[in-house]
């Protein structure tokens, strides 16, 4: 649906969601790409986020999440997709000033630690702040990388160990718990209660 929608159609839908959140008291939110996973759709989504941000009254923090999942057309060419994100997409969105952050989903079902390192290292070189979807389904899938790279946040962390949480604290990485994901996707909340 996102790939087929026009920029104006996405803007209308985004306004609806923004207005609903504003009605609930939200004054600042993060909006991520990552549902198009090709150049045109990622740029379209980020330009919609910029337009919505310019309208106000809600402050929107734009984040590139092209490393959310490997798109079907790259199923057998993962490395090519990772290189494209790191070497082409990130420089383009950074040069256009479309994002403040770059996020990557580091997990068995998404991107490996090395693939995530490639994407986030490129983002860091281009002046973007970092976020990592980390240790959501299995420990050791991204939180240590978040600490190593000095990410702003490590998100999810349902399976993070106490040692990993301590490394995040020592590195100044803010852990972010996403309760909706926790309760919708995982029967065990692991270390989430201790983080909160």
List where the protein language model places each region.
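Alpha-helix termination/capping residues and helix-transition junctions
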Residues: 23, 95-99, 148-151, 170
């Amino acid at each position: 649906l996102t790939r087929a929608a026009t920029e104006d159609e996405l803007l209308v839908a985004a306004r609806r969601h923004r207005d609903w959140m504003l009605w609930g008291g939200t004054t600042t939110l993060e909006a991520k790409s990552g549902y198009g996973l090709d150049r045109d759709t990622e740029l379209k989504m980020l330009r919609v986020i910029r337009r919505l941000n310019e309208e106000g009254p809600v402050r929107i923090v734009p984040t590139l999440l092209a490393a959310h999942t490997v798109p079907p057309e790259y199923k057998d060419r993962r490395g090519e997709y990772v290189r494209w994100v790191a070497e082409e997409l990130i420089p383009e969105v950074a040069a256009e000033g479309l994002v403040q952050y770059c996020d990557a989903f580091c997990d068995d079902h998404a991107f490996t630690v090395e693939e995530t390192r490639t994407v986030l290292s490129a983002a860091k070189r281009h002046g973007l702040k970092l976020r990592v979807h980390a240790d959501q389904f299995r420990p050791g899938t991204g939180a240590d990388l978040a600490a190593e790279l000095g990410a702003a946040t490590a998100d999810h962390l349902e399976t993070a160990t106490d040692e990993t949480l301590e490394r995040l604290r020592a590195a100044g990485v803010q852990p972010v718990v996403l309760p909706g994901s926790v309760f919708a996707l995982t029967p065990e909340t692991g270390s989430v209660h201790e983080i909160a």
